[in-house]
Amino acid sequence: MARCRRHIRSRSRSRNQCQRRRRRSHYNRRRTYRRSRRHSRRRRVRRRGCSCRRCSRRRRRRC
């Protein structure tokens, strides 16, 4: 039975490859969008805790 099940699984995979690819591409798009938001947040955090000459002179922690 295990062999038969494996064969069935492989068949279903080959059939649903295009559908899976579509789903993956859509998921990746959302993922990249999330990443970009995260990066922007990180940059803001860095700006808050800045330690450059300009910020130290003006007693600011932003660049």
Swiss-Prot record:
Q: Does the keyword Cell cycle apply?
A: no
From the Swiss-Prot or TrEMBL record, state where the protein is found: Nucleus; Chromosome
Which stretches does the entry tag as region Disordered? 1-47
The tissues where this chain's protein is expressed are given as: Testis.
A GO BP entry is: spermatogenesis
Q: What is its main location?
A: nucleus
GO molecular-function terms, A-Z:
DNA binding
Q: What is this protein called?
A: Sperm protamine P1
Protein species of origin: Planigale tenuirostris
